[in-house]
Regions:
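An acidic-aromatic loop/edge-strand motif
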Residues: 1-16, 20, 72-73, 79, ...
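Aromatic-lined ligand-binding clefts that engage carbohydrates, nucleic acids, or primary amines
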Residues: 4, 28, 36-64, 98-102
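Generic marker of residues within folded, mature protein domains
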Residues: 24-26, 39-41, 50, 74-76, ...
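Short beta-strands within extracellular/lumenal beta-sheet-rich domains
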Residues: 25-39, 81-84
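Short hydrophobic beta-strand segments in globular cytosolic domains
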Residues: 67-68
Length: 125
């Protein structure tokens, strides 16, 4: 989306040069926004959002509406997926906006990792 800096979601946030003012790896909240064109074929189907690796706590909004939360999970715990039913909030056949807030501030000794995978939508059979 306009006004946002693109970053690689397959690498830890702290490995991409975003340091705090003192030069240390950033620790705190990260915001991610994704625009997704959801195919009209999804109409009437259950739609799940899956982020295979997100460290350490995450909240999700779809088209400006709160969708849910994945509670804090230590960074070393795997799998670290965030999977949520977003069916009532998605508009199939249109562009949709997904926002994820990731909090990495619960452990000051841990640098911000954030999303480390490509997210995807699917419809269970």
């Amino acid at each position: 989306p306009a006004g946002w800096t693109p970053i690689d979601t397959t690498r830890p946030f702290y490995r991409q040069g975003y340091d705090d003012p003192r030069g240390y790896p950033y620790v705190g909240h990260l915001w991610y926004r994704f625009q997704l064109d959801v195919p009209a074929a999804f109409q009437g189907k259950k739609i799940m959002l899956c982020v295979p690796v997100v460290v350490t706590e995450a909240w999700c909004w779809v088209n400006g509406q709160y969708a849910g939360h994945r509670p804090y999970q230590e960074a070393y715990v795997r799998p670290a997926e965030f999977e949520i039913d977003i069916t009532p909030l998605v508009r199939p056949g249109q562009m949709n906006l997904i926002a994820l807030r990731v909090d990495t501030s619960l452990s000051p000794a841990q640098a911000a990792e954030g999303i480390q995978s490509r997210m995807f939508l699917y419809s269970p059979k």
